[in-house]
Every structure is written in C-alpha cells, then in structure tokens.
Amino acid sequence: MASNSSSCPTPGGGHLNGYPVTPYAFFFPHMLGGLSPPSSLPGIQHQLPVSGYSTPSPATVETQSTSSEEIVPSPPSPPPLPRIYKPCFVCQDKSSGYHYGVSACEGCKGFFRRSIQKNMVYTCHRDKNCIINKVTRNRCQYCRLQKCFEVGMSKESVRNDRNKKKKDVPKTECSESYIVTPEVEELIEKVRKAHQETFPALCQLGKYTTNNSSEQRVSLDIDLWDKFSELSTKCIIKTVEFAKQLPGFTTLTIADQITLLKAACLDILILRICTRYTPEQDTMTFSDGLTLNRTQMHNAGFGPLTDLVFAFANQLLPLEMDDAETGLLSAICLICGDRQDLEQPDKVDKLQEPLLEALKIYVRKRRPNKPHMFPKMLMKITDLRSISAKGAERVITLKMEIPGSMPPLIQEMLENSEGMDTLGGQPGGPRTGGLGPPPGSCSPSLSPSSTRSSPATHSP
C-alpha cells in the first residue's frame, strides 16, 4: 500500500502510474480516466484518493457524468424544419418567400417588378375593386397592382434591387461569334423583302398634315376616323400579303392561318405605325404620307389607347431597329404556337424556331457589344400584346361612337378567336373563322386564300 501511495496524483504535481502529471491535470478529466473536474480548487485534496489511484466503478462514472455537462455528449440536433411561408399576400397562392417586403408567389413578384421597372399604366374596366386571387389575378392588372401596394410591396425595393444587380454584375463583352449560314441569310432576306414590299419606309413617303382637331382632344373626329379606318383596312390587307410571303406560313391549315392573322394583326399594325414615329414633332406617319400629332391620333379613334401607343413608340427608339429586325419581330408575333384554337400548334412552333434563331444571330452580329438587345426586342412582343388587348376593348366603345357601322374587315379581324365576337357576338355561337365577308359586303375577306394584292393599297 505504501508503494501505491507514492504514485498517487497530487494537486501540486507528481506521477500517475509512471507518467508525469502537470499541476493542472484536473482541468482535463479525460486524462484521468473519466473523472469529473473538481467543483472548487480548495477542495481538491478531498476529492482525490490519497492511498492510490483506482478506476472508478460504472456507477461512479454515471453519477459523475450526470453531474458535469463537460463530459456528457449532447444528443444530435434534429434536422431543421422546412421553412414555411405565409400564402401570397396578393393572390393567396403558394408563396416562394418574402419579395419586396411581403410574402408573395413568383407570379405576383414578377408582375410587380415588371410593372414598376417599366412604369406600366393599367386601366380597370370595372369599378376598381376586382377580386384578386390565384384564379382571377390575370384578369385585371390595375387591381392586381393596387393590391400589391395595399399589402405593402415597396417600389423602392424594386429600384434598389435593380441598382444592386447593375453594380454586382460585371459588364461582359459578347464572346460568342455568330456566323450567318446561307440558310439563315436567305430567311432574313425573304422576311426583309416581305416587310419592305408591304410597308414602305418613312423616308420613302411624301408626308402631309391636316388641321383637323390638331390642338384639342375630343371624343372622336369623324373626318379623321373615316381616313383612319380606310387606312386600317388597307393595313390588314397588307398584313395578309406579308404573312403569305413568310416561309412555311401557307403550309399551315387555312383555319390556323386565319387564327394567327386575327390574333396578331393588331400587334403588327401597332408595331408598324410605331416605327414611323417622329419624336421631335411627336407625330406618326401612315403609308399614304398622312402625318398626325398625338392629339389627332387620339381624335382619329385611338382615344385612351393613344398615350400607351406613343409610349411604346418611344421605347422602340433606343433599339434602332432596321427593316430586317422589324420584319422578323412581326413574323415572330404572327407565327406563334401559343395562340388559342390552333389545330397544329407544334407545327407553328417549328416554323417560329428558325425565325427566332435568325433574329438572334442578326441582332447580335449587328450589335456585337450589346448582347442584351435580342431579349429586349423579344420583350416588346409582351408589350404589344398588352396594348392590343386594350385596342380590342377600345373597338367595342368605338363602335358606339361612330355614326355608321364598323368597316367589315376591321370587325372580322377583331373577332375573338375563342368564339366571342368582340363587337357584339354571342359566346359559344357558330364560328365562320373569317372565311368570307358579311353578306352584301364588297370588302375583301381576312382569309389568306381570298385576299388579293392591290397596287393601289397601302398599309398605315
């Protein structure tokens, strides 16, 4: 026993079974076989054996381990629960997180961002109290935007986010090289030619003006309306001629050709007239040379659509589009597989693909240092559709303002492809598909197979 006591660890130092022990070994209990550290320094001598070191019993270890947090391993942490957000504050759809200050879905987040970044101006055609939910949210953009503001979405968050992205994303030069193959070059030239033959450039026109209601807005100037409706009818005919020259368009079924023309004719009309915008005089010029200022355009029939159209024309100016780009963008608007009631949407999509590729290659080759110009052009199609939808609504109110009947070809062009005549038809009624003019009319039909080119007609 005496020999064992000589190897007993002491607080001041010594040896433990032949190994030296530092004076502060009690601070590391694992070195002492699992012993707990002392609760206080003065009582250390009472807690350590004086007759020799012995291995503590399991009961002792259990007691000691429960009295010390340092040697009891903590149980593994459970995996974090998935983060659950409140439903979208705007439409009550499933939220993807907090966007611009509130819980919102991806749809409402994107709608709010686009509305603020583009300074969109919407109109409610009811009482400005439309119900907004995940089913109805796309029916009224005005009320949807108002609800975004009501639930707390912040304009400044959109602007700050945009500025941050501009700072964070370094400017990169377009490193891709775009080679125009003979096939692509041939397609571009065909579309350019089709556009130029059906829509003369502004520099080719002999501009003239009129003094009709040029200074004050009125609900409708009948003389200007008569001239505008005449030019619009000619524009529809020229749009059909343009479509017939596009590669592959006439291989579609007659029904699909008519569906595409009726869906996109107003898009193309607006795009074309906006390329003839002169910002210095704030005027637009039609194909016969008639040049109208903003007030006259309003009084000719554009009405509440006027400022939207002029704003779109201003947005086109920085793009500096030439005839090939305008023609290709018009063709992409026309040949689009997402139009309703198409018989062969997949075939339409396949016809659109080379047009998209041709526009991308042409735009990026023409502007090698502006890689974002191509997507900017494509985004204009969305703007055109928005304006065209309001244009179709404008025709309904215009029908009540004009003294006579709506020109047959304009009425046929705006017949809704879902079976509702926007000018007074009944939903679900029989569809003529625009195969011929109304009985007794001498106006040409919208049908591509029946429209004839006329050297005397010019589009707006």
Curated annotation (Swiss-Prot):
Residues 425-435 have a biased composition (Gly residues). Its main location: nucleus. Keywords: DNA-binding, Metal-binding, Nucleus, Receptor, Transcription, Transcription regulation, Zinc, Zinc-finger. Ubiquitous. A motif (9aaTAD) lies at residues 408-416. It is found in: Nucleus. It comes from the Eukaryota. Residues 442-460 have a biased composition (Low complexity). Coiled coil: none annotated. GO terms for molecular function: nuclear receptor activity; RNA polymerase II cis-regulatory region sequence-specific DNA binding; zinc ion binding. Residues 154-182 are annotated as: Hinge. A zinc finger (NR C4-type) spans 88-108, 124-148. GO terms for biological process: cell differentiation; hindbrain morphogenesis; negative regulation of transcription by RNA polymerase II; positive regulation of transcription by RNA polymerase II; response to retinoic acid; retinoic acid receptor signaling pathway. InterPro entries: NHR-like_dom_sf (IPR035500), NR_DBD_RAR (IPR047159), NR_LBD_RAR (IPR047158), Nucl_hrmn_rcpt_lig-bd (IPR000536), Nuclear_hrmn_rcpt (IPR001723), Retinoic_acid_rcpt (IPR003078), Znf_hrmn_rcpt (IPR001628), Znf_NHR/GATA (IPR013088). Pfam families: Hormone_recep, zf-C4. GO terms for cellular component: nucleus. Residues 88-153 bind DNA. Residues 52-69 have a biased composition (Polar residues). Signal peptide: none annotated. Receptor for retinoic acid. Retinoic acid receptors bind as heterodimers to their target response elements in response to their ligands, all-trans or 9-cis retinoic acid, and regulate gene expression in various biological processes. The RAR/RXR heterodimers bind to the retinoic acid response elements (RARE) composed of tandem 5'-AGGTCA-3' sites known as DR1-DR5. Required for hindbrain patterning and appears to be required for skin development. Heterodimer; with an RXR molecule. Binds DNA preferentially as a RAR/RXR heterodimer. Composed of three domains: a modulating N-terminal domain, a DNA-binding domain and a C-terminal ligand-binding domain. Belongs to the nuclear hormone receptor family. NR1 subfamily. This is Retinoic acid receptor alpha. It comes from Gallus gallus (Chicken).
